[in-house]
Regions:
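Short, conserved alpha-helix in the C-lobe of eukaryotic-like protein kinase catalytic domains
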Residues: 159-171
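Conserved catalytic-loop aspartate of Hanks-type protein kinases
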Residues: 156
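A conserved short helix/loop substructure at the end of the activation segment
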Residues: 203-216
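Activation segment/activation loop of eukaryotic-type protein kinase catalytic domains
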Residues: 94-136
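Activation segment signature within eukaryotic-like protein kinase domains
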Residues: 76-77
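Conserved end of the kinase activation segment
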Residues: 140-153
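Conserved structural core of kinase catalytic domains
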Residues: 29-71
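Protein kinase catalytic-loop region centered on the HRD/HxD motif
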Residues: 81-93
Length: 217
């Protein structure tokens, strides 16, 4: 089942319909990012103007060697981090990501799925029912063995880091049902040493969730 429905109305106009009660928060993000957009209450859809809209998965396949350039990866980090912070202010948080969750709208990267989005209580995501493990997961989700269960919202920092590693290096941190170890991750990201992205990844892929930061400097 599709997480969202994207339709091309004409050459430069699109409609986007997302499912889930929490979709209004994602619509609000899109309205902040895209200047020319209108929300239609009757259809629970947003209409916007853009020259090019494609799924992020397809966008990656169109890049050289199926990888983002360093500059495009910086844009990915900046765009998605802003959306994470916005949702946190609204007391919502992602617990992980799937590549199908993201659209590329005129080279801007936008979350378009509420599947992995839950309310926050005291900066924690509360799990009261079973979930499907997102492909860009985090160590905390593997500890989810009983319900109810709570995880600090910073768990998604690791998931974003895993997405960035895949987008830039074409390498998954999740293999089967196991995440790479810290030593394995250090080896994977070693080619990025002394770049802004390298230190960003070191911060958000920290084993200790309390030490994780979304900071690109």
């Amino acid at each position: 089942m599709s997480k969202f429905i994207l339709k091309k109305i004409n050459d430069f106009t699109y409609s986007l319909k997302m499912s889930g009660d929490n979709s209004i928060y994602l619509y609000n993000i899109i309205k902040k990012i895209l200047q020319s957009c209108i929300f239609d209450n009757e259809t629970n859809s947003i209409f916007f103007s853009a020259e090019n809209v494609i799924p992020f998965k397809q966008y990656l396949l169109e890049q050289q060697n199926n990888k983002l350039s360093h500059s495009k990866c910086v844009k990915l980090i900046d765009d998605l981090s802003k959306q994470i912070f916005f949702l946190n202010k609204c007391n919502f948080g992602f617990y992980g990501f799937d590549i199908e969750d993201i659209l590329t709208i005129d080279n801007t990267f936008i979350f378009c799925s509420t599947q992995n989005l839950l309310p926050l209580e005291n900066d924690c995501i509360i799990f009261t029912s079973p979930i499907n493990q997102p492909y860009f997961s985090n160590p905390e989700l593997f500890k989810l063995t009983s319900l109810p269960f709570e995880i600090n919202t910073k768990c998604c920092y690791y998931s974003l880091g895993a997405l960035v590693v895949f987008s830039l290096l074409n390498t998954y941190l999740l293999v089967g049902n196991e995440l790479k170890t810290s030593k394995e991750i250090d080896k994977i990201i070693e080619p990025l040493f002394n770049t802004k992205i390298y230190w960003f990844l070191k911060r958000c892929l920290d084993d200790d969730i309390n030490n994780r930061k979304l900071l690109l400097v």
